[in-house]
Amino acid sequence: RRAGKIAIVLDDFGGGGHAIAARFCALQQPMTLAILPNEGQVSDLSNRAHANGHQVLVHLPMEPEGGQDPGEGAISVDQDNKEIRRRIRQALKKVPHARGISNHMGSKATADERVMQQVLNELKARNLLFLDSRTTANSVAYDMAIDMDLHAYTRDLFLDQVDDIEAIEARLWDLAGIAARAGQAVGIGHDRKATLLALTSILPRLETRGFRFVPISRLLP
């Protein structure tokens, strides 16, 4: 029976309640917390996650299709190269222990080669990783990052598009199936109670079947 490595990335931290964040940080299995850089208590949350053995990413707001507001400090396609790079440096400074960046929204920005070149250049200069959340099939980010020899990853599944414990548990089993076939898998969830309860229930059961939970940087790019 084959198992594999699983990285679970939890998005949108920093904007929610501190109580739920503390409970995610208390999970025994290593998680990767993607923290919005311009929300309150970002530094405290990042320090706590790191101290508890979890990995930290900057969850960088990026421009989506359709005009929805991605949040303060977002990267957009109408910014010049200098401004894009300034915003990335600023975001990285705000989140201690960050091992890289993932995109928050960003269906427009991640499809733009010029924009992504600036993002990836900043990461390469610092030996940081990029996770493409794949909010659009048109994203060029992952392929560009691989071509530039960055450590880059892309998600296999969103875990909690349906905010229901049983639905999320089923997605975790699906994710394990991918890891069993491919040797590794990346699942993205969010800082929600149903997600926390599903992880608490399913992760120990997957561990008994030989699956290993690791920070995202421990996967093969």
Q: Where do the PLM segments sit?
A:
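Active-site beta->alpha N-cap acidic-glycine motif
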Residues: R2-E72
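A generic structural motif
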Residues: I35-L36, L60-P61, G210-P221
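Active-site mouth loops of central-metabolism enzymes
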Residues: K5-D12, E72-K82, Q161-A167
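Structured catalytic-domain cores with a bias toward divalent-metal coordination
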Residues: W173-A176, G183
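Catalytic domains of cell-wall/extracellular-matrix polysaccharide-remodeling enzymes
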Residues: N81-W173, H190-E207, F211, S217
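Active-site-adjacent loops and short helices of periplasmic peptidoglycan-processing enzymes
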Residues: P64-E65, V77-Q79, K108
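Structural preference for beta-strand elements that scaffold enzyme active sites
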Residues: K5-A7, P30-A34, Q55-L57, A98-S102, ...
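Glycine-rich anion/phosphate-binding loops
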Residues: N38-D44, V77-R86
